[in-house]
Each structure stands twice: as C-alpha cells, then as structure tokens.
C-alpha cells in the first residue's frame, strides 16, 4: 500500500493561476500528508541520498496509471520525490542524478498544469494501491 507521507513534490516557482491552485488544494484535502515544496531553484543536496528522485520531463518515459502504481510500489518504503521544473524544465545535471525521467503524456503541458496533473495522478496511484474505486480502468 502506498501512502502520501512517502511522496513529495518539489517544484520551481509558485502557481499563479487560481483555478490550478484550487484544483491542487482539492487533492491536498484528500492527501494532507503529501508534501509540496515550491522554491526558486532545486537544491538536490537537500534530498536524502536514499530517496528516489523522479524528474518530470518531456523526454521521460510514460506509464499508465496502473503501471506507475506498480513502479512506485517497487520502491518499497523509500521516500519518493517528484521534481517539476519551470517553463525551462529541469537542469540536465539534476536529471542525470535522478532514478527516473517521467513524462505525464506525449503532449506538452504548461508547468503549472503539469503540477495539477501530477497531484491527481498521485491521488490515483494511492487509490489504486489501496483498492479504492476512484480508478475505474
């Protein structure tokens, strides 16, 4: 079973669009233990060495929601950190240190919308791992 307290999102910049912030807040109410850090830059040294780092990037690998669930469950009890860049993406030196490059879709999304989609997918993955009816494949 996957729990929100093992998952963190590190994102560059603050969300400016109210409707996106409201959407994220709706999912945060369902997952109060999910950590979302917004800052001006990534400090990868602050992420513990034994944590899993997943960078969201357009050149990453895509998974179905059930495949992503299986992948994250394979990380056992490790903390999982998702990194989302700004409009310029994630610097290559940080991508090189990640465990996985993840693409949410072959489509390109604005970084703020990608954050909302990621939060929804995290909720979906947790629901799948818990046997909740939220995900109806």
Curated annotation (Swiss-Prot):
One of its GO terms (cellular component) is cytoplasm. SUPFAM superfamilies: alpha/beta knot (SSF75217). Pfam families: SPOUT_MTase. Coiled coil: none annotated. It is an enzyme of class 2 (transferase). The keyword Repeat does not apply. The keyword S-adenosyl-L-methionine applies. One of its GO terms (molecular function) is rRNA (pseudouridine-N3-)-methyltransferase activity. It comes from the Bacteria. InterPro entries: Alpha/beta_knot_MTases, RasGAP_dom, RlmH-like, tRNA_m1G_MTases_N. Disulfide bonds: none annotated. Specifically methylates the pseudouridine at position 1915 (m3Psi1915) in 23S rRNA. Homodimer. Belongs to the RNA methyltransferase RlmH family. This is Ribosomal RNA large subunit methyltransferase H. The lineage of its organism: Bacteria, Bacillati, Cyanobacteriota, Cyanophyceae, Synechococcales. The gene is rlmH.
């Amino acid at each position: 079973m996957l729990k929100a307290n093992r998952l963190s999102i590190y994102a560059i910049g603050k969300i400016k669009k109210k409707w996106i912030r409201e959407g994220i807040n709706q999912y945060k109410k369902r997952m109060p233990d999910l950590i979302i850090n917004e800052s001006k830059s990534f400090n990868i040294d602050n992420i513990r060495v034994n944590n899993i780092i997943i960078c969201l990037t357009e050149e990453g690998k895509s998974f179905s929601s059930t495949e992503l669930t299986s992948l994250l469950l394979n990380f056992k009890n490790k903390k999982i950190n998702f990194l989302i860049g700004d409009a310029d993406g994630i610097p290559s030196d940080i991508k090189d240190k990640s465990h996985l490059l993840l693409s949410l879709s072959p489509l390109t999304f604005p970084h703020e919308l990608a954050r909302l989609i990621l939060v929804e997918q995290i909720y979906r993955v947790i629901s799948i791992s818990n046997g909740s009816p939220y995900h109806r494949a």
